[in-house]
Protein backbone atom coordinates (compact mmCIF):
# COMPACT_ATOMS: atom_id res chain seq x y z
CA UNK A 1 0.00 0.00 0.00
CA UNK A 2 1.48 3.38 -1.02
CA UNK A 3 1.51 6.37 1.28
CA UNK A 4 -0.86 8.15 -1.13
CA UNK A 5 -3.72 5.66 -0.71
CA UNK A 6 -4.82 6.76 2.80
CA UNK A 7 -4.74 10.39 1.63
CA UNK A 8 -6.78 9.52 -1.46
CA UNK A 9 -9.36 7.71 0.67
CA UNK A 10 -9.67 10.71 3.01
CA UNK A 11 -10.08 13.09 0.08
CA UNK A 12 -12.82 10.89 -1.36
CA UNK A 13 -14.66 11.06 1.97
CA UNK A 14 -14.32 14.87 2.02
CA UNK A 15 -15.62 15.07 -1.56
CA UNK A 16 -18.62 12.92 -0.63
CA UNK A 17 -19.35 15.20 2.35
CA UNK A 18 -19.02 18.28 0.12
CA UNK A 19 -21.64 16.84 -2.24
CA UNK A 20 -24.01 16.32 0.71
CA UNK A 21 -23.36 19.90 1.89
CA UNK A 22 -24.23 21.24 -1.58
CA UNK A 23 -27.47 19.26 -1.63
CA UNK A 24 -28.37 20.59 1.84
CA UNK A 25 -27.57 24.19 0.81
CA UNK A 26 -29.81 23.81 -2.24
CA UNK A 27 -32.59 22.41 -0.03
CA UNK A 28 -32.13 25.30 2.41
CA UNK A 29 -32.43 27.82 -0.43
CA UNK A 30 -35.67 26.17 -1.58
CA UNK A 31 -37.02 26.58 1.97
CA UNK A 32 -35.90 30.24 1.94
CA UNK A 33 -38.02 30.71 -1.19
CA UNK A 34 -41.03 29.20 0.62
CA UNK A 35 -40.39 31.56 3.55
CA UNK A 36 -40.34 34.43 1.04
CA UNK A 37 -43.73 33.35 -0.32
CA UNK A 38 -45.12 33.25 3.23
CA UNK A 39 -43.78 36.75 3.91
CA UNK A 40 -45.36 37.94 0.67
CA UNK A 41 -48.78 36.78 1.89
CA UNK A 42 -48.35 38.09 5.45
CA UNK A 43 -46.65 41.31 4.28
CA UNK A 44 -43.81 40.88 6.75
CA UNK A 45 -40.38 42.46 6.10
CA UNK A 46 -37.81 40.28 4.38
CA UNK A 47 -35.29 40.85 7.15
CA UNK A 48 -35.98 39.75 10.71
CA UNK A 49 -32.91 40.88 12.66
CA UNK A 50 -34.03 39.28 15.94
CA UNK A 51 -34.58 35.94 14.20
CA UNK A 52 -31.15 36.17 12.51
CA UNK A 53 -29.42 36.96 15.83
CA UNK A 54 -31.21 34.09 17.64
CA UNK A 55 -30.29 31.74 14.80
CA UNK A 56 -26.59 32.64 14.97
CA UNK A 57 -26.48 32.39 18.76
CA UNK A 58 -28.09 28.92 18.65
CA UNK A 59 -25.72 27.74 15.90
CA UNK A 60 -22.66 29.03 17.78
CA UNK A 61 -23.76 27.06 20.85
CA UNK A 62 -24.31 23.92 18.75
CA UNK A 63 -20.98 24.50 17.00
CA UNK A 64 -19.09 24.52 20.30
CA UNK A 65 -20.40 21.02 21.01
CA UNK A 66 -18.75 19.94 17.73
CA UNK A 67 -15.51 21.87 18.50
CA UNK A 68 -16.26 24.53 15.85
CA UNK A 69 -15.25 28.04 16.88
CA UNK A 70 -17.73 30.94 16.93
CA UNK A 71 -15.90 32.99 14.28
CA UNK A 72 -16.08 30.13 11.77
CA UNK A 73 -19.79 29.53 12.41
CA UNK A 74 -20.58 33.26 12.25
CA UNK A 75 -18.78 33.86 8.92
CA UNK A 76 -20.30 30.78 7.32
CA UNK A 77 -23.90 31.43 8.34
CA UNK A 78 -23.78 35.19 7.73
CA UNK A 79 -23.10 34.31 4.09
CA UNK A 80 -25.96 31.78 4.06
CA UNK A 81 -28.33 34.32 5.66
CA UNK A 82 -27.32 36.95 3.08
CA UNK A 83 -28.15 34.51 0.28
CA UNK A 84 -31.57 33.84 1.83
CA UNK A 85 -32.31 37.57 2.18
CA UNK A 86 -31.33 38.37 -1.42
CA UNK A 87 -33.23 35.35 -2.77
CA UNK A 88 -36.40 36.49 -0.96
CA UNK A 89 -35.94 40.10 -2.12
CA UNK A 90 -35.71 38.93 -5.74
CA UNK A 91 -38.87 36.85 -5.29
CA UNK A 92 -40.87 39.79 -3.90
CA UNK A 93 -39.65 42.10 -6.65
CA UNK A 94 -40.56 39.64 -9.41
CA UNK A 95 -44.07 39.34 -7.97
CA UNK A 96 -44.58 43.10 -7.54
CA UNK A 97 -43.28 44.10 -10.98
CA UNK A 98 -44.58 41.00 -12.83
CA UNK A 99 -41.09 40.26 -14.17
CA UNK A 100 -40.75 37.19 -16.37
CA UNK A 101 -37.93 35.22 -14.72
CA UNK A 102 -37.32 33.00 -17.76
CA UNK A 103 -34.58 34.90 -19.59
CA UNK A 104 -32.99 38.31 -20.07
CA UNK A 105 -30.43 39.80 -22.43
CA UNK A 106 -27.91 41.74 -20.35
CA UNK A 107 -25.36 44.17 -21.79
CA UNK A 108 -22.01 44.61 -20.04
CA UNK A 109 -18.49 45.90 -20.70
CA UNK A 110 -16.11 43.61 -22.53
CA UNK A 111 -16.19 40.07 -23.87
CA UNK A 112 -16.63 37.17 -21.44
CA UNK A 113 -14.39 37.19 -18.38
CA UNK A 114 -14.51 40.90 -17.52
CA UNK A 115 -15.54 41.97 -14.03
CA UNK A 116 -18.70 43.43 -15.59
CA UNK A 117 -19.41 40.03 -17.14
CA UNK A 118 -18.99 38.36 -13.73
CA UNK A 119 -21.33 40.95 -12.16
CA UNK A 120 -23.91 40.40 -14.92
CA UNK A 121 -23.75 36.65 -14.33
CA UNK A 122 -24.22 37.19 -10.58
CA UNK A 123 -27.29 39.37 -11.15
CA UNK A 124 -28.77 36.99 -13.71
CA UNK A 125 -28.24 33.92 -11.50
CA UNK A 126 -30.49 35.41 -8.83
CA UNK A 127 -33.18 36.87 -11.09
CA UNK A 128 -33.41 34.80 -14.30
CA UNK A 129 -33.32 31.19 -15.42
CA UNK A 130 -31.39 32.03 -18.59
CA UNK A 131 -28.81 34.76 -19.20
CA UNK A 132 -28.24 35.94 -22.78
CA UNK A 133 -24.85 37.69 -22.92
CA UNK A 134 -24.28 40.92 -24.80
CA UNK A 135 -20.69 42.15 -24.41
CA UNK A 136 -19.91 45.73 -25.47
CA UNK A 137 -16.67 47.60 -26.19
CA UNK A 138 -17.63 50.88 -24.50
CA UNK A 139 -19.92 52.13 -21.73
CA UNK A 140 -21.85 54.23 -24.27
CA UNK A 141 -22.55 51.07 -26.30
CA UNK A 142 -24.01 49.37 -23.22
CA UNK A 143 -26.45 52.24 -22.61
CA UNK A 144 -27.35 52.35 -26.31
CA UNK A 145 -28.14 48.62 -26.45
CA UNK A 146 -30.77 48.95 -23.72
CA UNK A 147 -32.12 52.31 -24.94
CA UNK A 148 -32.71 50.86 -28.42
CA UNK A 149 -34.20 47.57 -27.20
CA UNK A 150 -31.29 45.35 -28.24
CA UNK A 151 -30.84 44.32 -24.58
CA UNK A 152 -33.17 44.20 -21.58
CA UNK A 153 -30.70 45.31 -18.91
CA UNK A 154 -27.33 47.00 -18.57
CA UNK A 155 -24.85 46.19 -15.81
CA UNK A 156 -22.22 48.92 -15.32
CA UNK A 157 -19.64 49.66 -12.61
CA UNK A 158 -20.26 52.94 -10.81
CA UNK A 159 -17.73 53.09 -7.96
CA UNK A 160 -14.75 51.24 -6.52
CA UNK A 161 -13.46 51.37 -2.96
CA UNK A 162 -9.89 51.87 -4.19
CA UNK A 163 -10.09 54.04 -7.32
CA UNK A 164 -13.35 55.87 -6.59
CA UNK A 165 -16.14 56.89 -8.96
CA UNK A 166 -16.35 55.60 -12.54
CA UNK A 167 -16.76 59.05 -14.08
CA UNK A 168 -17.67 57.86 -17.59
CA UNK A 169 -20.72 56.05 -16.19
CA UNK A 170 -21.82 59.03 -14.07
CA UNK A 171 -21.61 61.26 -17.15
CA UNK A 172 -23.77 58.86 -19.19
CA UNK A 173 -26.38 58.80 -16.41
CA UNK A 174 -26.89 62.55 -16.91
CA UNK A 175 -28.43 62.08 -20.33
CA UNK A 176 -29.97 58.61 -20.40
CA UNK A 177 -33.67 57.77 -20.27
CA UNK A 178 -32.87 54.50 -18.48
CA UNK A 179 -33.67 53.87 -14.82
CA UNK A 180 -31.57 52.19 -12.16
CA UNK A 181 -33.42 49.02 -11.12
CA UNK A 182 -30.79 47.14 -9.13
CA UNK A 183 -27.33 47.08 -7.63
CA UNK A 184 -24.71 44.56 -6.54
CA UNK A 185 -21.21 44.60 -5.09
CA UNK A 186 -18.42 42.43 -6.43
CA UNK A 187 -15.22 41.58 -4.56
CA UNK A 188 -12.32 42.48 -6.85
CA UNK A 189 -9.28 40.20 -6.62
CA UNK A 190 -6.76 41.20 -9.27
CA UNK A 191 -4.25 38.70 -10.62
CA UNK A 192 -1.34 38.96 -13.01
CA UNK A 193 -2.33 36.48 -15.73
CA UNK A 194 0.00 34.86 -18.27
CA UNK A 195 -0.38 32.36 -21.11
CA UNK A 196 2.37 29.94 -20.11
CA UNK A 197 5.40 29.36 -17.94
CA UNK A 198 7.20 32.62 -17.18
CA UNK A 199 8.28 34.79 -14.23
CA UNK A 200 8.03 38.41 -13.13
CA UNK A 201 11.52 39.26 -14.39
CA UNK A 202 10.56 38.19 -17.92
CA UNK A 203 7.43 40.37 -18.17
CA UNK A 204 7.82 43.66 -20.06
CA UNK A 205 4.22 44.57 -21.02
CA UNK A 206 0.99 44.48 -19.01
CA UNK A 207 -2.50 44.93 -20.50
CA UNK A 208 -5.68 45.95 -18.71
CA UNK A 209 -8.51 48.45 -18.36
CA UNK A 210 -7.46 51.76 -16.69
CA UNK A 211 -9.35 50.92 -13.46
CA UNK A 212 -7.22 47.89 -12.41
CA UNK A 213 -4.06 49.89 -13.14
CA UNK A 214 -5.29 52.60 -10.75
CA UNK A 215 -6.28 50.07 -8.10
CA UNK A 216 -2.92 48.24 -8.25
CA UNK A 217 -0.58 51.22 -8.73
CA UNK A 218 1.50 50.39 -5.62
CA UNK A 219 2.27 46.92 -6.96
CA UNK A 220 3.01 48.25 -10.45
CA UNK A 221 5.39 50.90 -9.09
CA UNK A 222 7.72 48.06 -8.09
CA UNK A 223 8.21 47.31 -11.80
CA UNK A 224 8.82 50.72 -13.44
CA UNK A 225 10.26 49.10 -16.58
CA UNK A 226 6.93 47.43 -17.44
CA UNK A 227 5.08 48.99 -20.34
CA UNK A 228 1.43 49.71 -19.48
CA UNK A 229 -1.05 49.11 -22.31
CA UNK A 230 -4.70 50.15 -21.88
CA UNK A 231 -7.56 48.05 -23.20
CA UNK A 232 -11.32 48.62 -23.28
CA UNK A 233 -11.92 45.91 -20.64
CA UNK A 234 -10.02 43.38 -18.55
CA UNK A 235 -11.35 40.61 -20.80
CA UNK A 236 -9.96 42.37 -23.89
CA UNK A 237 -6.58 42.36 -22.10
CA UNK A 238 -6.86 38.62 -21.37
CA UNK A 239 -7.77 37.98 -25.00
CA UNK A 240 -4.63 39.81 -26.16
CA UNK A 241 -2.37 37.83 -23.83
CA UNK A 242 -3.99 34.52 -24.79
CA UNK A 243 -3.48 35.28 -28.48
CA UNK A 244 0.10 36.53 -28.04
CA UNK A 245 1.31 33.31 -26.34
CA UNK A 246 4.40 35.25 -25.22
CA UNK A 247 6.30 34.93 -21.92
CA UNK A 248 6.84 38.71 -21.97
CA UNK A 249 3.20 39.86 -21.70
CA UNK A 250 0.61 39.67 -18.93
CA UNK A 251 -2.91 40.89 -18.17
CA UNK A 252 -4.42 42.34 -15.01
CA UNK A 253 -7.77 40.70 -14.34
CA UNK A 254 -9.71 38.11 -12.38
CA UNK A 255 -8.70 34.49 -11.94
CA UNK A 256 -12.19 33.39 -13.03
CA UNK A 257 -11.88 35.45 -16.21
CA UNK A 258 -8.37 34.17 -16.88
CA UNK A 259 -9.61 30.59 -16.71
CA UNK A 260 -12.01 31.30 -19.59
CA UNK A 261 -9.01 32.27 -21.75
CA UNK A 262 -6.70 29.47 -20.62
CA UNK A 263 -4.45 31.83 -18.64
CA UNK A 264 -2.55 31.02 -15.45
CA UNK A 265 -2.10 33.15 -12.34
CA UNK A 266 1.49 34.37 -12.09
CA UNK A 267 0.88 36.62 -9.07
CA UNK A 268 -2.10 37.45 -6.86
CA UNK A 269 -2.02 41.21 -6.39
CA UNK A 270 -3.03 43.09 -3.28
CA UNK A 271 -4.76 46.28 -4.41
CA UNK A 272 -3.89 49.69 -2.93
CA UNK A 273 -6.85 49.20 -0.60
CA UNK A 274 -6.97 45.75 0.95
CA UNK A 275 -10.76 45.43 0.77
CA UNK A 276 -11.31 46.08 -2.93
CA UNK A 277 -14.97 46.14 -3.99
CA UNK A 278 -16.76 47.49 -7.05
CA UNK A 279 -20.40 48.51 -6.90
CA UNK A 280 -22.42 47.90 -10.06
CA UNK A 281 -25.84 49.26 -10.97
CA UNK A 282 -28.44 47.61 -13.20
CA UNK A 283 -30.32 49.77 -15.72
CA UNK A 284 -33.56 49.12 -17.63
CA UNK A 285 -35.89 51.08 -19.90
CA UNK A 286 -38.69 51.05 -17.33
CA UNK A 287 -38.49 52.08 -13.67
CA UNK A 288 -39.61 49.53 -11.09
CA UNK A 289 -41.61 49.63 -7.88
CA UNK A 290 -39.87 48.46 -4.73
CA UNK A 291 -41.80 46.51 -2.12
CA UNK A 292 -41.99 48.20 1.27
CA UNK A 293 -40.96 44.81 2.69
CA UNK A 294 -37.53 45.29 1.13
CA UNK A 295 -34.82 47.85 2.09
CA UNK A 296 -34.65 50.36 -0.76
CA UNK A 297 -32.29 52.94 -2.16
CA UNK A 298 -33.15 55.96 -4.32
CA UNK A 299 -30.65 57.73 -6.58
CA UNK A 300 -31.18 61.39 -7.48
CA UNK A 301 -29.49 63.74 -9.92
CA UNK A 302 -29.78 67.44 -9.12
CA UNK A 303 -28.27 70.81 -9.97
CA UNK A 304 -28.28 73.54 -7.33
CA UNK A 305 -27.91 77.27 -7.81
CA UNK A 306 -24.43 78.81 -7.74
CA UNK A 307 -25.10 80.91 -4.66
CA UNK A 308 -23.21 80.14 -1.45
CA UNK A 309 -24.79 77.41 0.65
CA UNK A 310 -27.08 76.06 -2.08
CA UNK A 311 -25.87 72.46 -1.72
CA UNK A 312 -25.99 72.64 2.08
CA UNK A 313 -29.59 73.88 1.88
CA UNK A 314 -30.51 70.88 -0.27
CA UNK A 315 -28.81 68.42 2.06
CA UNK A 316 -30.58 69.92 5.07
CA UNK A 317 -33.87 68.91 3.45
CA UNK A 318 -32.79 65.28 3.69
CA UNK A 319 -31.74 65.68 7.31
CA UNK A 320 -35.01 67.36 8.23
CA UNK A 321 -36.89 64.33 6.91
CA UNK A 322 -34.57 61.81 8.63
CA UNK A 323 -33.30 60.52 5.28
CA UNK A 324 -29.83 58.95 5.22
CA UNK A 325 -27.58 59.83 2.29
CA UNK A 326 -25.07 57.06 1.56
CA UNK A 327 -23.23 58.72 -1.33
CA UNK A 328 -22.72 62.19 -2.81
CA UNK A 329 -20.84 62.57 -6.09
CA UNK A 330 -20.32 65.69 -8.21
CA UNK A 331 -19.68 65.93 -11.95
CA UNK A 332 -19.21 68.98 -14.19
CA UNK A 333 -22.07 70.06 -16.45
CA UNK A 334 -20.64 69.95 -19.97
CA UNK A 335 -21.02 73.27 -21.74
CA UNK A 336 -21.51 75.15 -18.44
CA UNK A 337 -18.05 75.93 -17.01
CA UNK A 338 -17.75 75.73 -13.19
CA UNK A 339 -21.27 74.31 -12.80
CA UNK A 340 -21.85 70.86 -11.34
CA UNK A 341 -24.47 68.14 -11.13
CA UNK A 342 -24.80 66.15 -7.91
CA UNK A 343 -25.62 62.46 -7.63
CA UNK A 344 -27.14 61.33 -4.33
CA UNK A 345 -27.86 57.83 -3.04
CA UNK A 346 -30.54 57.94 -0.35
CA UNK A 347 -31.45 55.03 1.89
CA UNK A 348 -35.22 55.22 1.34
CA UNK A 349 -38.07 54.00 -0.81
CA UNK A 350 -39.15 56.56 -3.40
CA UNK A 351 -42.81 56.05 -2.43
CA UNK A 352 -42.31 56.64 1.29
CA UNK A 353 -44.05 59.69 2.75
CA UNK A 354 -40.82 61.35 3.94
CA UNK A 355 -39.13 60.82 0.57
CA UNK A 356 -42.07 62.35 -1.29
CA UNK A 357 -42.05 65.39 1.01
CA UNK A 358 -38.29 65.79 0.54
CA UNK A 359 -38.60 65.58 -3.26
CA UNK A 360 -41.25 68.29 -3.25
CA UNK A 361 -39.01 70.61 -1.20
CA UNK A 362 -35.93 69.82 -3.28
CA UNK A 363 -37.87 70.61 -6.45
CA UNK A 364 -38.54 74.09 -5.08
CA UNK A 365 -34.91 74.96 -4.20
CA UNK A 366 -32.87 73.25 -6.95
CA UNK A 367 -32.39 74.31 -10.58
CA UNK A 368 -33.19 70.82 -11.81
CA UNK A 369 -33.79 67.38 -10.33
CA UNK A 370 -34.26 63.89 -11.73
CA UNK A 371 -34.93 60.55 -10.06
CA UNK A 372 -32.51 58.06 -11.64
CA UNK A 373 -34.18 55.11 -9.96
CA UNK A 374 -35.46 53.40 -6.84
CA UNK A 375 -34.27 49.83 -6.35
CA UNK A 376 -33.70 47.16 -3.67
CA UNK A 377 -30.58 47.71 -1.59
CA UNK A 378 -28.36 44.64 -1.81
CA UNK A 379 -26.11 45.79 1.03
CA UNK A 380 -27.10 43.12 3.54
CA UNK A 381 -25.36 44.26 6.73
CA UNK A 382 -24.53 41.08 8.68
CA UNK A 383 -25.96 40.65 12.16
CA UNK A 384 -23.39 40.51 14.95
CA UNK A 385 -24.45 37.80 17.43
CA UNK A 386 -22.35 39.20 20.30
Curated annotation (Swiss-Prot):
Residues 1-92 form the Chorismate mutase domain. Its main location: cytoplasm. Changing residue 28 to A/K: Important decrease in catalytic efficiency and affinity. Pfam families: CM_2, PDT. Residues 286-386 are annotated as: Regulatory (Phe-binding). PROSITE patterns: ACT, CHORISMATE_MUT_2, PREPHENATE_DEHYDR_1, PREPHENATE_DEHYDR_2, PREPHENATE_DEHYDR_3. Gene3D superfamilies: 3.30.70.260, Chorismate mutase, Periplasmic binding protein-like II. The record marks 278 as: Essential for prephenate dehydratase activity. Keywords: Amino-acid biosynthesis, Aromatic amino acid biosynthesis, Cytoplasm, Isomerase, Lyase, Multifunctional enzyme, Phenylalanine biosynthesis. InterPro entries: ACT-like_dom_sf, ACT_dom, Chor_mutase/pphenate_deHydtase, Chorismate_II_sf, CM_dom_sf, CM_II_prokaryot, CM_P_1, Preph_deHydtase. Both activities are inhibited by L-phenylalanine. Residues 299-376 form the ACT domain. Catalyzes the Claisen rearrangement of chorismate to prephenate and the decarboxylation/dehydration of prephenate to phenylpyruvate. Homodimer. This is Bifunctional chorismate mutase/prephenate dehydratase. It comes from Escherichia coli (strain K12). The lineage of its organism: Bacteria, Pseudomonadati, Pseudomonadota, Gammaproteobacteria, Enterobacterales.
Amino acid sequence: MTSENPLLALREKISALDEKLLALLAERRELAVEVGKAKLLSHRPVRDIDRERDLLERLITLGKAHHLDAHYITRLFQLIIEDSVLTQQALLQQHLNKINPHSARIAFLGPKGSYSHLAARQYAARHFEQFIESGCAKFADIFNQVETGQADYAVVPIENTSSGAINDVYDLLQHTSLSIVGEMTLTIDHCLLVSGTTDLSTINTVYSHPQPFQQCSKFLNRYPHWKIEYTESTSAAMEKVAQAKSPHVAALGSEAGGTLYGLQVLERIEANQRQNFTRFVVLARKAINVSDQVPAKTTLLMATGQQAGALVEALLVLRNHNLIMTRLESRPIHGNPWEEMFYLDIQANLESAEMQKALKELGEITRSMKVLGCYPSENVVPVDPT
